Amino acid sequence: MSYIPFPNISPELFSIELFGVTFALRWYALAYIAGLLIGWRLVLRMIRAERLWSFGPPMTEDQLERLLTWVILGVILGGRMGFVLFYQPAHYLAHPLDILKVWEGGMSFHGGFLGVMTALVAFCLKERISILPVADLLAAATPPGLFLGRIANFINAELWGRPTTLPWGVAFPGEAAQSCPGIEGICARHPSQIYEAGLEGILLFAVLSLLVWRRGWLHWPGSVSGVFLAGYGATRFLVEFVRQPDAQFVSAGNPLGLAWQISGYGLTMGQILSLPMILLGLYLILRSRRTA
């Protein structure tokens, strides 16, 4: 069976030791930082492009700088609490202090999304500015961060896919990745992180950029947010078919790791959380076109 060996890349970009304590910059942290900075620059560019707006941009550059702080808090707190509540509530209920151990991993995009939306609504109410136009700005600028995050997932050798015999399957390191029932020898898996980087990062960014810069969709508040939500939800829903589910959902009677099932059919937790995003996205698209 042909497969691609996992590249020997350290999850740490570099580390330094000060006063007996080791500080390391991990690729995952760098992806968060770079994603936020790129997103900020993209939003700033859209705010400055007067032709994109019917009655001017929804917020000033100073308000954008203040919003960035709210978004950072929403991403971190929402992402962490989403993982705690959606994926391992029993563990963290028994060990509540483990919630603070963010360096051990455990972030949820869907939780981060809810955190950012909460921060966005609170900020807009405080600043007395319209929510949907600002949401459109954030939606159009989010995919580069998703792309970098998925590449960091790949470098960390985490969130890999299900076993595959396809020639581009990757032999991820680690006992968990190489534990494949019914497969002897090397176990190759779908590089689902790369699939997601291409779909929710590159493809979604290309579509949103076309709609913003060529089609003028920022003139219809909610339309860009709707495309982002429906697009991310749909791509995540599809990739879940080849993505290895979280270990806590997998058992002898549930080898596919379905969080909900009936008569042998069901959905993973990622698919369950993506369905509301798809429905909300479609609603926003229809609403924006109806009120145009």
Curated annotation (Swiss-Prot):
The keyword Nucleus does not apply. One of its GO terms (molecular function) is phosphatidylglycerol-prolipoprotein diacylglyceryl transferase activity. A 1,2-diacyl-sn-glycero-3-phospho-(1'-sn-glycerol) binds at R150. It is found in: Cell inner membrane. Signal peptide: none annotated. The chain crosses the membrane at residues 18-38, 67-87, 105-125, 193-213, 222-242, 266-286. Its EC number is 2.5.1.145. GO terms for cellular component: plasma membrane. InterPro entries: Lgt (IPR001640). It comes from the Bacteria. Belongs to the Lgt family. NCBIfam families: lgt. This is Phosphatidylglycerol--prolipoprotein diacylglyceryl transferase.
